Amino acid sequence: KPSNIIQWLKYFSPNKISAPKVGVNFIYGDFLYLFSNEKASKLKNKFTEMVWQHSNGLHDLVFRNRNLFQIQNAFSYMTWNQMYLLCRQYHTYLKKIKSIYKNDKIFQKYLKEDAKSFDKKLTKNQLDFFLEEHLLFYLVLKGQIKLPNEYIQGREKWALFCYPGNAPKGFVYLFQKNFFKLPQIQPYEGQYNLETKKFIDFHNVDLETYSVK
């Protein structure tokens, strides 16, 4: 909910952020949910409406709190399909990760466990959902995808990936193995859990004892 996001933002500012040097990008996973057997036109209408309502609601709340979030153009909103155009090698990476999955039994094991953690069956659609989601955020944190932000304008030194919950095992495994041999450009690679307010450093995770839920 937009109201939850505002509360999380208020935790960061001014508690964690004291200088006007940070931008925020909200990414909507609308295209990810097309991995479904539902009719495409029905899904399009459903998620277009959902993204529109959520982003406008969030935009309004950011504006209402402008005394706290003073730099309005530091907040950027984008949909999943926009990210495809931000990495010219995306399709090559996607083909490669699918090939890796077919041959890596440990990767298969972790994605199966992730599906179970989220009360899902690892169908082809669910598998494609996981692989694409993990890959795109991996590419963001590896600097292969630069998220556009009107205020930051490409000057970012690092990106903090935030989500309400623990990262799936398959996502953590992707960083630990670094199949594409991409350099680490950030001091830490991981995910900030908005619920627990703790950062999960993927390179310090023992996946055999780690719990997603």
Predicted segment positions?
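Compositional signal for N-terminal targeting/processing segments
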Residues: 1-213
